[in-house]
């Protein structure tokens, strides 16, 4: 168990007090306390489609999907059920420059939220059958995106503005690239990019005293 210790910086205004803490392993923790009946906890990674090479188009997004599909401790059903059983919500998204995983729940359940986010970050197993299932889901998403004028304009703009650069490539990837990913590809991208120096843990809302907050799994990050 680790206490929240490290270099600190406080940001204050009339409505909230935010504190950032940087640990020795490079991980940053952002604590934003304000009067709310709920709590949001998130993992924000400085990793997105911009980190992909031409053979990896869409892998950051697929890795985000696969994070919810099983760990060493939970299967896909358990990950959702444990959060939903306490009235919470868990979700994620991938952008060109970031990937985020987050939960929203009651302050009294903050340890559960931290535990599950830590589990999917540290212990995802990428089951082969789930890879095939999510491959189909994402290829369907690509087809839907190709039928949406707004998405087509967005992708075209970026491809012209950032020619021959990864930021100009589509976040979802292509049917060909997504169709070729396997477990080793996902693990390699994860090992290269999912590390403490790329990670911000954000905790926002009404919570227990932040000076006494413990992160049970932070030593393993």
Where are the regions that the model predicts?
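Short basic coil micro-motifs at the edges of alpha-helical modules that engage polyanionic partners
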Residues: 1, 20, 71, 175-178
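Single conserved hydrophobic/aromatic residue that forms the stacking wall/gate
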Residues: 1-13, 212-221
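Residue-level micro-sites within transmembrane alpha helices that shape
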Residues: 2, 60-64, 133, 218-219
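His/Glu-rich zincin catalytic helix
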Residues: 12-78, 187-213
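Charge-rich, well-structured scaffold segments of protease-associated domains
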Residues: 22, 76-213
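Charged, solvent-exposed alpha-helical segments that act as regulatory interaction surfaces
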Residues: 72, 126-127, 221
């Amino acid at each position: 168990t680790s206490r929240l210790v490290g270099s600190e910086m406080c940001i204050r205004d009339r409505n909230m007090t935010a504190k950032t803490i940087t640990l020795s392993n490079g991980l940053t923790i952002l604590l934003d306390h304000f009067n709310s009946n709920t709590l949001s906890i998130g993992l924000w990674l400085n990793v997105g489609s911009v980190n992909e090479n031409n053979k990896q188009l869409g892998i950051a997004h697929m890795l985000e999907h696969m994070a919810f599909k099983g760990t060493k401790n939970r299967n896909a059903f358990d990950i959702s059920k444990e959060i939903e059983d306490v009235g919470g919500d868990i979700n994620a998204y991938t952008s060109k420059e970031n990937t985020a995983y987050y939960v929203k729940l009651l302050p009294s359940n903050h340890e559960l939220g931290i535990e599950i986010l830590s589990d999917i970050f540290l212990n995802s197993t990428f089951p082969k059958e789930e890879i095939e299932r999510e491959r189909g889901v994402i290829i369907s998403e690509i087809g839907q995106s190709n039928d949406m004028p707004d998405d087509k304009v967005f992708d075209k703009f970026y491809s012209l503005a950032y020619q021959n650069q990864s930021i100009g490539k589509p976040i979802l990837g292509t049917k060909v690239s997504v169709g070729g990913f396997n477990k080793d590809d996902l693990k390699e991208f994860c090992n290269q990019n999912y590390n403490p120096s790329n990670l911000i843990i954000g905790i926002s809302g009404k919570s227990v005293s932040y000076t006494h907050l413990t992160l049970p799994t932070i030593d393993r990050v």
